[in-house]
């Protein structure tokens, strides 16, 4: 299907003989060529999939490309705005130390991009649900696996809302370091869209979710820090705090996580 600005599903591995499809969804600030190649995702699940399986990255407008920091214009919003942001960042560092202070103060620099990415979510969730609908229409036996990291988990949640209305099912879903709310009212109804389970991998060591996400969203229940609160028996919450020490470690440690907790 045609998607705006070449966003949408990008094939990483296609096969006409496969009934299994894996779709990866990256998070905030992932609009960069290395992220689109999805080498980390592919390496992480390699032992648990067949060589003939189809693999796609869902490329979406996820906000600021971090490579654009090279051309960042510090006073583009005026000197007072820049001073205010710098003052808050400095105060956070003084109060909480360098690492935690930066994570608490830096959201001021990302706020516009974060809002843009969140606003884009429903549009791209519509696109992803249409892509999945097309796959299932072409091959009802196609087992579709979804993998999401960070804000990509929220895009998957919005996609599930669409699939629920269309009565479309996928096979399984894996969420890592989720930048998404864990309220039961949002998850219970849509949990059975993923027929054989939604696996939520979280870590109490995820400072990005703990400080940056919670400041941006004012949400005390992100699924990247704690369990999804749910009455559904189709959602499995798995604490990986003893394996994952930070937000960017999830994709590097998928093999370790799957080896211990799950086999596709």
What residue ranges belong to the model's regions?
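Serine-dependent carboxylesterase/thioesterase catalytic core
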Residues: 2-3, 40-41, 73-77, 81-223
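Short, surface-exposed "cap/lid" segments of acyl-processing enzymes
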Residues: 6-97
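Hydrophobic/aromatic beta-strand patches that form the interior of the parallel beta-sheet core
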Residues: 21-23, 56-59, 174, 199-201, ...
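Conserved beta-strand elements of beta-rich interaction domains across eukaryotes
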Residues: 22, 28-30, 62-65, 151, ...
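Short, conserved catalytic or adaptor-binding loops enriched in Gly and charged residues
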Residues: 45-50, 190-192, 224-233
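Hydrophobic anchor at the start of a short beta-strand
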Residues: 55, 144, 148, 235
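C-terminal catalytic-base region of ester-bond hydrolases, centering on the histidine
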Residues: 209-264
């Amino acid at each position: 299907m045609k998607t705006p600005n070449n966003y949408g599903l990008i094939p990483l591995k296609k096969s006409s003989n496969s009934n299994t499809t894996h779709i990866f969804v990256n998070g905030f600030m992932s609009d960069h060529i290395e992220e689109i190649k999805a080498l980390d995702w592919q390496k992480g699940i390699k032992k648990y999939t067949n060589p003939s399986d189809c693999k796609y990255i869902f490329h979406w407008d996820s906000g600021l490309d971090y490579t654009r920091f090279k051309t960042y214009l510090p006073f583009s919003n005026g000197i007072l705005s820049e001073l205010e942001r710098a003052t808050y960042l400095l105060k956070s560092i003084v109060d909480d130390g360098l690492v935690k202070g930066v994570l608490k103060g830096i959201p001021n620099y990302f706020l516009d991009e974060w809002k843009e990415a969140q606003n884009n979510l429903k549009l791209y969730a519509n696109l992803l649900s249409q892509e999945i609908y097309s796959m299932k229409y072409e091959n009802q036996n196609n087992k579709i696996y979804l993998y999401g990291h960070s804000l990509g988990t929220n895009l998957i949640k919005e996609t599930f809302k669409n699939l629920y209305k269309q009565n479309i099912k996928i096979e399984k879903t894996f969420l890592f370091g989720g930048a998404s709310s864990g309220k039961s009212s949002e998850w219970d109804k849509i949990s059975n869209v993923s027929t054989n389970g939604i696996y939520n991998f979280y870590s109490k060591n995820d400072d990005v979710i703990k400080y940056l996400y919670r400041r941006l969203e004012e949400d005390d229940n992100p699924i990247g820090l704690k369990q999804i609160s749910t009455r559904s028996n189709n959602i499995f919450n798995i604490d990986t705090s003893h394996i994952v020490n930070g937000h960017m470690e999830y994709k590097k440690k998928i093999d370790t996580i799957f080896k211990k907790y799950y086999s596709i």
